[in-house]
């Protein structure tokens, strides 16, 4: 295979195979592809529209070149990493729901990064709340064993991504790189929730997760444009269970929500995002707390801890309102 020939196929609006995508991205991860060729590759793929095989191939290359954990974890893992990029400016729902899930006994390996399109990425908000996000590999693995929660800072675990950094920054628009990050948790969790920035990606992502062999996974996009479960509008999601894919919708009205304030979910700055996150963790019954409970409830559903998302929401809501999640997080950061 020759990288230029692969790019030419994409320019001609032809799909490339899993093998071709993996070959090209593997060369990128080794610093063997010029920035001009890489820019052409991701731009042509974006213009054509990324296929399942292309995203899968690029994901396999990123996983192959990531750091590998030295620990064999004796339990099932969940990740709540999403694509971001929905442009909505909501609080860090997936991060706060990950903390809530960990407080309920779910082992969470949260894979994330600094802000890309929002005011605060998962790394940013955790740091603002007092959590050490840039720990060593040994510390990250030890935290999961001892605390049931850990954070994998993507740049540390994917050092080969440095070869793509300047191209991504210069282009400034979403490419296949925005897709493969959430699919490339180095701890290879068996369970995963991914929120995506476009509705059609729920189908693409669940098929990639199916190939990757996850036990159970869920990919969602809400009808008001969020890459998470919405408390305001119906959320459409695909579910992978026992290697079978199914399609569903969740209407938050089934939870009896009324008079929820959007300003309690949306942040206009990193400082505002921190204020809202602290209000959620401090058990205030605001809209943001409902949003976190709903998404944590979906996590309990994916893990098989409950039979429905509604049941999961009620358990997560109680953990947040009772102070259980707050106490867990306080214990977590007191050990930093």
From Swiss-Prot:
Residues the entry annotates as binding Mg(2+) 2: 227-228
Residues that, per the record, bind anthranilate 1: 82, 113
Example GO molecular function: magnesium ion binding
SUPFAM superfamilies the record matches: Nucleoside phosphorylase/phosphoribosyltransferase catalytic domain, Nucleoside phosphorylase/phosphoribosyltransferase N-terminal domain
Binding residues for anthranilate 2: 168
Residues annotated to bind 5-phospho-alpha-D-ribose 1-diphosphate: 82, 85-86, 90, 92-95, 110-118, 122
Residues reported to bind Mg(2+) 1: 94, 228
Superkingdom per UniProt: Bacteria
A biological-process GO annotation: L-tryptophan biosynthetic process
Pfam family, one: Glycos_transf_3
Catalytic class of the enzyme: transferase
Co-factor binding comment: Binds 2 magnesium ions per monomer.
EC number(s) from the headed UniProt entry: 2.4.2.18
Pathway(s) served: Amino-acid biosynthesis; L-tryptophan biosynthesis; L-tryptophan from chorismate: step 2/5
Catalytic activity: N-(5-phospho-beta-D-ribosyl)anthranilate + diphosphate = 5-phospho-alpha-D-ribose 1-diphosphate + anthranilate
Keywords, ordered alphabetically: Amino-acid biosynthesis, Aromatic amino acid biosynthesis, Glycosyltransferase, Magnesium, Metal-binding, Transferase, Tryptophan biosynthesis
Subunit structure: Homodimer.
NCBIfam families noted in UniProt: trpD (TIGR01245)
Protein name: Anthranilate phosphoribosyltransferase
Native source species: Leptospira borgpetersenii serovar Hardjo-bovis (strain JB197)
């Amino acid at each position: 295979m020759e990288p230029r020939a692969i790019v030419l196929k994409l320019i001609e609006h032809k799909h490339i195979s899993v093998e071709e995508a993996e070959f090209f991205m593997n060369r990128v991860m080794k610093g063997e592809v010029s920035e001009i060729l890489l820019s052409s590759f991701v731009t042509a793929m974006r213009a054509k529209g990324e296929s399942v095989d292309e995203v899968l191939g690029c994901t396999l290359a990123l996983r192959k070149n990531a750091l590998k954990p030295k620990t064999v974890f004796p339990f099932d893992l969940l990740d709540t990493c999403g694509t971001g990029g929905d442009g909505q400016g909501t609080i860090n729902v997936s991060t706060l729901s990950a903390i809530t899930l960990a407080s309920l006994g779910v082992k969470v390996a949260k894979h994330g990064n600094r802000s890309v399109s929002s005011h605060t990425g998962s790394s940013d908000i955790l740091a603002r709340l007092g959590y050490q996000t840039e720990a060593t590999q040994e510390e990250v693995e030890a935290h999961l064993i001892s605390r049931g929660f850990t954070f994998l800072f993507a740049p540390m675990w994917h050092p080969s991504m440095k070869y793509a950094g300047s191209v991504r920054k210069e282009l400034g628009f979403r490419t296949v790189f925005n897709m493969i990050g959430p699919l490339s948790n180095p701890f290879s969790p068996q369970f995963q929730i991914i929120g995506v920035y476009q509705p059609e990606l729920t189908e693409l992502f669940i098929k990639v997760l199916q190939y990757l062999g996850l036990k159970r996974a869920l990919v969602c996009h809400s009808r008001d444009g969020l890459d998470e479960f919405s408390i305001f509008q119906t959320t459409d999601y695909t579910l992978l269970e026992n290697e079978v894919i199914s399609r569903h919708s969740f209407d938050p009205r089934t939870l009896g929500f009324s008079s929820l304030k959007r300003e309690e979910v949306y942040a206009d700055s990193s400082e505002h995002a921190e204020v809202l996150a602290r209000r959620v963790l401090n058990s205030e019954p605001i809209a943001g707390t409902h949003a976190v409970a709903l998404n944590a409830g979906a996590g309990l559903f994916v893990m098989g801890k409950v039979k429905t998302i509604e049941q999961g929401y009620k358990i997560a809501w109680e953990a947040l309102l009772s102070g259980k999640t707050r106490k867990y997080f306080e214990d977590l950061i007191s050990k930093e």
